Amino acid sequence: MKTKAGFVALIGKPNAGKSTLLNTLLNAHLALVSHKANATRKLMKCIVPFKDKEGYESQIIFLDTPGLHHQEKLLNQCMLSQALKAMGDAELCVFLASVHDDLKGYEEFLSLCQKPHILAVSKIDTAVHKQVLQKLQEYQQYASQFLALVPLSAKKSQNLNALLECISKHLSPSAWLFEKDLMSDEKMCDIYKEIIRESLFDFLSDEIPYESDVMIDKFIEEERIDKVYAHIIVEKESQKKIVIGKNGVNIKRIGTNARLKMQEVGEKKVFLNLQVIAQKSWSKEEKSLQKLGYIYQRNRD
């Protein structure tokens, strides 16, 4: 069997649809999805097998990254640093831009990335045909920069094989790097953590999801049930009260929603215990961020 394998960094501005694309390719709910921008905070490896037209069985290891953005808060700097690291580690990059975006995001990407890349224009199902053609024409001025230009819709599964074909074409022949049926090398407790975070974005408004995070305190994995003990961390006591809600109604909704998604992903029953704590300025303190698993690479220039 002829095989290829390689790491592919998936880069884009917030809300470009990176996580939706990966979940569609995997036919599973692993990457956090929200209609709110900047939901993804940590790099996640997602493994997609694909047989290309040349007969290669390719193992495409996508590096799902936080959206490219610049803010002074240390948490946001951690997120940007992970996206930059993924670009450096990958053999190939895919820059995903919404059909509704201007060209500034792609121009910023070009200033940051020296790796070969594919430009993918997403959400074409949300625009009329003329608008899609116009956007593709605008990107043609950069034709010497990208390997291929692929319009697609993750929601409608349009042109996804074309994207995978382009990626596989530019990967080097190699033995597979992971087991055949593995979709991610993430630990299940880390996937569960992201599911809880997704529920925060689903049920809380305004700034609270952006000023909150989740810590798994204890994870017990049994044959028929996973037991998850976690706490939600916010920055203010007033936010804690909102997360809990009157008579605990909000935390119950968040917990139920998260638990059902966990059971779907883990394919077993899940017991979930959620607590809420307030810790002022946690998103600005390096030690607090390290405890939550964030890595900040300082610029040493």
Swiss-Prot record:
One GO process term, biological-process aspect: ribosomal small subunit assembly
Chief localization: cytoplasm
Any one cellular-component term (Gene Ontology): plasma membrane
UniProt-annotated binding residues for GTP: 12-19, 64-68, 122-125
Subcellular location: Cytoplasm; Cell inner membrane
MF GO annotations: GTP binding; GTPase activity; ribosomal small subunit binding; small ribosomal subunit rRNA binding
Keywords: Cell inner membrane, Cell membrane, Cytoplasm, GTP-binding, Membrane, Nucleotide-binding, Ribosome biogenesis, RNA-binding, rRNA-binding
Region annotation G3: where it falls in the sequence: 64-67
Ranges for region G5: 152-154
Region (G2), start-end ranges: 38-42
Positions of the UniProt region annotated as G1: 12-19
Residue span(s) of domain Era-type G: 4-173
Membrane topology category: Peripheral membrane protein
Stated role: An essential GTPase that binds both GDP and GTP, with rapid nucleotide exchange. Plays a role in 16S rRNA processing and 30S ribosomal subunit biogenesis and possibly also in cell cycle regulation and energy metabolism.
PANTHER family, per the entry: GTPASE ERA, GTPASE ERA, MITOCHONDRIAL
Complexes and interactors: Monomer.
Family: Belongs to the TRAFAC class TrmE-Era-EngA-EngB-Septin-like GTPase superfamily. Era GTPase family.
Protein name: GTPase Era
Origin species: Helicobacter pylori (strain Shi470)
